[in-house]
Structure formats: C-alpha cells, structure tokens
C-alpha cells in the first residue's frame, strides 16, 4: 500500500507528465539562475555531472561540449523531451536515485526537493545527492523561499502550498511546494551530512541556494 508521501510523489509525477511540453517551453538556457550558471562554469572540464530533477534539461545545455551530463527526472514525459534533445536522462525518484555510490564529480538539484512534503524526506533526498557524489565533489541545491522580493510574481500565505501551472489549453494543474524559511535549507543539509563543507549559503531572487563540497 502506498503511503501518503508516496502518493504525493506520484501526484507530482502525474502533474509534470501533463504539463511537460508547455512547462518545457517556458524553460530555456537563457533563464538559468545565476548561481546555477556560475556552478556549472566553474566545474573542471570532463567532469561527470548529475542533474537530479532535470526537467527539460535546460541546465545541461551549458558547457555540454566540455562536461558529461547524466540527468534524472520523475516525469516520463520530461525524460522523453530530454532524450529527444540528445541528453542522457533516466526516469527515477530522488529518494532512490538509480546511480552508484560516489558516481559523479558534481551534482545539481535545482527546484526539486521543495516538492517533498516532510522534513525527513527532504533530508533523505539530500543524503541521496551526497551519496552519488565523489568525495571532494561539488553539490548545489536550490529551493523556493517563502519570502519573495517585491518584484516577484510569487506570493505565498503559508509554508506549504499548492502552486498552479496553467497549460495553453487553459487546464490548471497544482503542484505541492514547501516554501523555505531563512536557514532552513542549511539546517537540513547539515543534518543530512554534518561533515559537508559549505562553500556558499545564499538567497537569490526568492530562492535559497547551498553550494557544498562532499567529503
């Protein structure tokens, strides 16, 4: 029998399958967040980079001639979009990433773990990201923040919300988001692995960002 948390992840998978094409059309390499771009640009050439929750693969377009990417997404439709574009992407769950221990040189999780409903799940997901990354490897985690800049279209009234996405045909779908408070992501990361070296902990355009080095 599926637990409530498993059901929620299945719901997220189903929603992204429904919105995949229209969602993908709103995500291009030209709207990659600054911290993500900086993270990718600073990686050594020939690094093997995992993008966990890669969506349409927009981040994997950067330095794709110098880096080797492997992506994973929960949505079959997103995986198909990525594969059509020539990216090496598999379907999977962030709580059970289908990669070996210490497999990649760097790992990205961009706007993913805020879809998990409990702190325990989010910490487990962070441990999975660390597990697949080699010692001395780099890790970036990016999540939505509760407090948003005045210029943002995002406005939240609680720390757990169902956020709408409307397809071109007018159908609206809702995705669960946990909206982080200041210091919350850092706390989860340090609970997941107290020995992790934190390189940066910052706020960017209504998001919290952690960049770390694994041990």
Model-derived segments and spans:
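Short catalytic micro-motifs in class I SAM-dependent methyltransferases
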Residues: 111-115
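Functionally critical, cavity-lining and gating residues within the transmembrane helices
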Residues: 105, 122
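Class I (Rossmann-like) S-adenosyl-L-methionine-dependent methyltransferase catalytic domain
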Residues: 1-50, 55-96, 120, 138-215
